[in-house]
Amino acid sequence: MSLRTIGDEVYASFLQHSANARVVLLHASGRYRSVLVSRLLASPDRRAFYYAMSADDVDVPAFLSGLTHDLSEQVPAFGNQVNRLGFSNVNFDDLAAALAADLSTLSSEPSLLILDEFDQAEIADDLQIFLEVLIDHLPAQCQLVFNSRSLPRLPWIALIAQKKAVMLRDAELVTNNFYEPAADADNRIKVYCLGPGHVVLDGKLIDTWEGHLPRLLLFFSLDRPMVTRSEICHAFWTDMNTDQAVNVFHVTKRRLHKALEAIGPDILVHEGGYYRVNLMINIQYDIIDFVMALIEGRTASDNKTKQAAWQRAIELYQHPFLQGHHEDWITHRRDEYQTGYIEALSELAYIRHSDKRPEQALALLQRAAADDPTRQSVHRDIMRLYAELNRRSETAGHFQKISADLHNRGLAVEPETARLYNELIDS
């Protein structure tokens, strides 16, 4: 097969699979990443803006300085918002909003921002956090593309669960083993985080943790391809100084290894300044199974397969992520995985409705609304179904209930929700 043909295939796959994603990762194991980047830059389908990361991009000021300099050579006005705000001592949400405003000036049409050679930069924790924040501020027409020989340490599994990101390995959509190929070994360890969080080794529940922190350290390390010690300390021990936090971290790590010593090698290894879960240990993780089901539901070509995938995702989501824990990093992830669960309920409701089973569709949507009462798109679908079933009084009652509930939460009824209600009542 010629390189041109391969380029056509990987480009077509990119267009197919990335259409609804904010972020695209060209997986490190792909052989034709550079071919695709060249094709994206040359394509007339959408405008692409390019920034090659370097060893200088170590923190937020350095990254923004380099990015605004290079992109201003492509679009002279780029960087005005960020430069006006400044790079240092600024809230990351404000800084990301300013960069997003600059990105929106690049093009009013769909466009790409390609961060190439991402592995060349020794990313500091502040830049890592900023990039995560930026994803939620990206303008609708701008898509972020990472090309790297190693996996950027973003929470890719959670991003995929929310439908914000996709991973591509050449022409293939990555649907499992998101971080590395699984070790060629039996699944001796099974990790369950959709619920209170527990670990099973060789069919037996592990209960020798010596506190909850070693167990949470394992769960935190599964979240990303790799983490720094400072990221761990910041997530777990914000009330301690650096030396105290490091000491407690090492004690916690030893307890984690002791609890799982029956597997042989240490489950958490240190490589090149980062900690990661040992790739020699094959772990069955319910979060991975859940996200795999979401991907299959999104990509399946027939309703039967879609239905089975959405149903599996719903069944896997027994309880919220690490239910009962209230650490900031946990509650943040909990909301993100809940987004995938609401999607599964809503999509299965759509299938039930298409199959002329509106009552079953309504029951699924009511479950979604109960799980997240603030998601107004679900409430709109419920009102549409009530109207379709000629349950006019319940349409009115539902709107009044959610209006009061949103008010009590300090939220407002969205104009689209109010407009739909008026249309349904007036019809």
Predicted stretch roles:
Residues 1-7, 13-16, 161, 166-167, ...:
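Short boundary/linker motifs that mark transitions into or out of structured domains
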Residues 185-187, 192, 251-281, 404-418:
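DNA-binding patch around the recognition helix
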